[in-house]
Amino acid sequence: MTQFSLNDIRPVDETGLSEKELSIKKEKDEIAKLLDRQENGFIIEKMVEEFGMSYLEATTAFLEENSIPETQFAKFIPSGIIEKIQSEAIDENLLRPSVVRCEKTNTLDFLL
């Protein structure tokens, strides 16, 4: 004879999943949504336009709002936004001069 308690019975909703399985599924859906780099780029672009933030400020705010560590930005932020942050930093002299020399792109200013 098998013994069991009422705690062993899992409550099930209409989808057939327990509460724990539902919470895991919801968490996976949220992570999948955050991994959509293109959508994240649109959100950051919208923040820049609406609030007049720089790309660096908007990206930092996005990462903080979604509890994403700054070290993992490459998984969540599209390369186009990263390039815009780099160009902003160079234009606004936010980088050391030695770094700017390495990152400076070729221009046709000498033709002017």
Swiss-Prot record:
InterPro entries in UniProt: LTACT_myovirus (IPR046384), Trans_coact (IPR031836), Trans_coact_sf (IPR042071)
A GO term for molecular function: transcription regulator activator activity
Region (Interaction with host RNAP) residue spans: 62-92
GO BP: late viral transcription
Region: Involved in transcriptional enhancement, residue numbers: 106-112
HAMAP family reported in the protein's UniProt record: T4_TRANSCR_COACT (MF_04165)
Free-text note regarding domains: The C-terminus is involved in transcriptional enhancement.
Family that this chain belongs to: Belongs to the Tevenvirinae late transcription coactivator family.
Quaternary structure and interacting proteins, as annotated: Interacts with the beta subunit of host RNAP RpoB (via flap domain). Part of the transcription activation complex containing host RNAP, the viral RNA polymerase sigma-like factor, the coactivator gp33, and the sliding clamp.
Function comment: Activates transcription at late promoters when the sliding clamp is present. Binds to both the host RNA polymerase (RNAP) and the upstream dsDNA.
Name by which UniProt lists this protein: Late transcription coactivator
Organism expressing this protein natively: Enterobacteria phage T4 (Bacteriophage T4)
Gene it is expressed from: 33
